[in-house]
């Protein structure tokens, strides 16, 4: 990347998904000197959060790719990796809510995945920008 990109993350300290996702995002940012990371708390920035709702909800973490050269948003991602998003949707379709058993299952998935899906999601998200850069 030749253009400075800020990875703006909206999150909260209590977010279980963020605990799994943020270390991977940090490593991605470290790979390119034009990447920057900024973290803001959802509850302290309601106006910002309202611009990046997921199905009408304030789901976090939400990662916004802000292009500093064009002063524009290139993309946003979150609140979960693609595989985890499907797992959540499928479970909610069958059970209506995410119970403690599912939440444990999701954490086991995160541990086994070791950030691979997050990396692949971001490669897919960033690939068009790399080609155009």
What are these regions (language model features)?
Residues 1-28:
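A glycine-rich, hydrophobic loop/mini-helix early in the fold
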Residues 62-64:
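Residue-level detector of beta-strand face positions
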Residues 1-3, 31-34, 50-59, 68, ...:
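Non-globular targeting/processing and membrane-anchoring segments
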Residues 18-19, 31-37:
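Short, solvent-exposed secondary-structure capping/transition elements
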């Amino acid at each position: 990347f030749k253009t400075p990109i800020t990875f703006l993350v909206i999150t909260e300290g209590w977010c279980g998904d963020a605990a799994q996702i943020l270390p991977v995002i940090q490593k991605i940012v470290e790979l390119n000197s034009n990447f920057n990371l900024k973290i803001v708390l959802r509850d302290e920035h309601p106006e910002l959060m309202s611009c990046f709702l997921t199905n009408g909800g304030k789901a976090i973490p939400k990662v916004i790719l802000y292009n500093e050269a064009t002063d524009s948003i290139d993309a946003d991602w979150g609140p979960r990796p693609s595989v985890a998003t499907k797992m959540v949707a499928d479970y909610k379709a069958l059970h209506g809510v995410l119970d403690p058993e599912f939440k444990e299952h999701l954490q086991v998935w995160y541990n086994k995945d070791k950030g691979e899906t997050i990396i692949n999601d971001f490669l897919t998200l960033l690939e068009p920008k790399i080609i155009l850069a």
